[in-house]
Amino acid sequence: MSSRSPDELLRIEGIRKTFPGVVALDSVDFDLRRGEVHVLLGENGAGKSTLIKMLSGAYTPDAGRILAGGEEVRIHGAQDSERLGIATIYQEFNLVPDLTVAENIFLGRQPRRLGMIDRKRMDADAEVLLKRVGVNVSPRARVRELGIARLQMVEIAKALSLDARVLIMDEPTAVLTSEEVDKLFAIVRRLREDGVGIVFITHHLEEIAALGDRVTVIRDGRSVGQVPASTPEDELVRLMVGRSIEQQYPRERTDAGEALLKVEGLTRDGVFHDVGFEVRAGEVVGIAGLVGAGRTEVVRAVFGADPYDAGTVHVAGAPLRRHDVNAAMAAGIGLVPEDRKGQGLVLDASVEENLGLVTLRSTARAGLVDLKGQHTAAERIAGQLGVRMAGLGQHVRTLSGGNQQKVVIGKWLLANTKVLILDEPTRGIDVGAKVEIYQLINELTAAGAAVLMISSDLPEVLGMSDRVVVMAQGRVAGELTAEQATQDAVMALAVSTHTGNSPHSGGTDGTEASRGH
């Protein structure tokens, strides 16, 4: 790496970290200067989280060294990290819900007067910090009363209370609205002007040019390049995944076969009305629409998770009993839900146990689980999907987002699913892992399965769908072939003023285009 700059706050040289069966980091170099935003970029599982845990004291390196202000340091815990002026804001906030904002900011460091906590001074000091980060919230408010964006500002205020010279932000925009992202960026720029060095981890390539100064790319646990933030996105993608992605949405179309899923007249009062569509073998049908269009509600009803009042669902020509998940699964329908962590996985169970969730009962012999058979099948499917893990016994919670999603899809592959419903299949997944999910979709349809996909990423819907069903206000506004489906054509249907089932009718919804359900 380059010789030390006088503005250098932090330097990592040749860091290596291993866990049983896994080399998490190998010969990683990184440096941070005063008053800059240095973006740390890499796929899920590349080693970014391990690196920031080194700097926050959660892990210690097996080899290499960390320098702060030019001096080699050893960080053995959070106190060492704080003493060096390093503060980390993780995706899951480190705040106590039942304490006030001020109590959280100064937790363990409350100002005292005559042996008692000086609440007046603590609240006043907290107010100064909150104003500095531009958030209008009372220091006496309970943290549990705050939304995500304000919680994040409290975390930043807490970091500033430690006189942090280095601020590490792990995917800070992941759950923010576009307006909240703009406010966060304004605060980050202000901190940069104040001389704070910021390590900014993001999946969103468009955020790099908007906010960053330099980018270090990590791939497979190694630092593979350090480039200016103005570097074109195509080059960043090539560095990140180790190959050029010529086609972002590599759909491999096959001839469609028989209708495996047929929905007619599906109605749930006040939610969706007279919804009809079909998905044929070898086909991907995307459902597009605006926020509140009813897309997720419809597919949950098809899967039997939610009730409906009228209409029919047929799988491979046979009628499906309504509001019966077991019947849907037995008929060959699988659902990969939007909330994979809350609904699609048992986070504290192993990869093997999660892969066997759907097939546990069907593979039992005389009422006993066939553990050997389950293990063999899980091993086969994990290998087929390319799940990056230490072994089948690894807890799913510790996998990256892309690998978690592969496990959710894998459990349905084990069950030989005929119709797979994907709700936000690539949300929170980096660009390399997205392509791997798209290839899985191709493999499914090549094998004769039918795929029904909802996504708030309209280019993804257009790029991967053979046909696009557009919904508006709980109705089908129209249907487009892959050739007809452009962004303008989809949005014209999604915001048109009349609804119905003709290919060019539509509905209204005064909300954000292509994001939500």
Curated annotation (Swiss-Prot):
Membrane topology of the entry: Peripheral membrane protein
Protein role: Part of the ABC transporter complex RbsABC involved in ribose import. Responsible for energy coupling to the transport system.
Self-association and partners: The complex is composed of an ATP-binding protein (RbsA), two transmembrane proteins (RbsC) and a solute-binding protein (RbsB).
Domain spans labelled ABC transporter: 10-245, 255-498
Top EC category: translocase
Organism this protein belongs to: Streptomyces coelicolor (strain ATCC BAA-471 / A3(2) / M145)
Binding annotation for ATP: G42, E43, N44, G45, A46, G47, K48, S49
One MF term in the entry's GO annotations: ABC-type D-ribose transporter activity
Protein name: Ribose import ATP-binding protein RbsA 2
Gene for this chain: rbsA2
